[in-house]
């Protein structure tokens, strides 16, 4: 939000793979960096993905406008104005992105805006199909036209997102207060910690599922440096010195 740049938030490993290639195209088209937000759950997962044909590497060349990459005060003021103007184009890209989908539903009492991986938690709770309209967002800036469409069709909105409630804050500012907007700020979802299918289930108004007790618990352990990391030897030496002194 502060960088005025393009941002993606994949909902699956396949989508993350596809977004990387599209991010390079977007970056070259608009001459800006593209960020990808990967949540902890996504980073600690793996899956088989379908890969595309390899592309030939671009020929290296000197940038046409080198000053735009040097953000000294004189350049940054001009660049900031340009980014504000280009942000309208970025929003149009998000409106038509295949990664942002509006899925209609018969029950208009609530519309659900699910960001990135949170979309999976919604669908996991509705294996037969969600009865509420769902707006899946995985490419930013916020597709405001899609949000306004949902707000005009539904009597309330539930924002399901990981981390800070940035989208919830933006939607509250965008809509004002014509309809209730629920999420982490309003208490329907926990303010801190990762989302899970179970706490999302509560926000959807569904009864809590009975779960079986775990057969055994994994004992907690402090974080460790990865095997093969060169820093392990340094810390081993430091611990040896500390024991001696």
Language-model-detected regions and their locations in the chain:
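Short, intrinsically disordered, charge-balanced linker/junction segments flanking boundaries
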Residues: 242-245
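Flexible, low-complexity linker and terminal segments
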Residues: 10-225, 230-231
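Conserved PLP-enzyme active-site core in the AAT-like
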Residues: 1
């Amino acid at each position: 939000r502060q960088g005025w740049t393009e941002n993606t938030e994949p909902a699956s490993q396949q989508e993350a793979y596809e977004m990387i290639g599209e991010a390079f195209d977007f970056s070259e088209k608009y001459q800006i960096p593209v960020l990808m937000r990967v949540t902890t759950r996504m980073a600690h997962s793996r899956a088989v993905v379908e890969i595309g044909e390899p592309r030939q590497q671009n020929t290296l060349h000197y940038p046409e406008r080198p000053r735009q990459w040097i953000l000294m005060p004189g350049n940054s003021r001009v660049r900031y104005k340009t980014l504000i103007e280009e942000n309208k184009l970025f929003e149009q890209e998000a409106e038509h992105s295949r990664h942002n989908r509006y899925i209609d539903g018969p029950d208009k009492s609530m519309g659900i805006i699910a960001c990135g991986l949170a979309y999976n938690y919604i669908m996991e709770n509705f294996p037969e199909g969600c009865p509420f309209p769902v707006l899946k967002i995985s490419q930013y800036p916020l597709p405001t036209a899609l949000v306004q469409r949902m707000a005009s069709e539904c009597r309330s909105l539930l924002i399901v997102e990981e981390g800070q409630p940035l989208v919830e804050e933006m939607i509250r500012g965008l809509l004002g207060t014509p309809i209730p907007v629920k999420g982490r700020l309003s208490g329907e979802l926990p303010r801190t910690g990762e989302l899970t299918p179970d706490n999302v289930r509560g926000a959807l108004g569904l009864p809590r599922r009975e779960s079986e007790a775990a057969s055994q618990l994994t004992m907690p352990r402090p974080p460790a440096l990865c095997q093969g990391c060169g820093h392990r030897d340094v810390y081993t030496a430091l611990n040896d010195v500390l024991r001696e002194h």
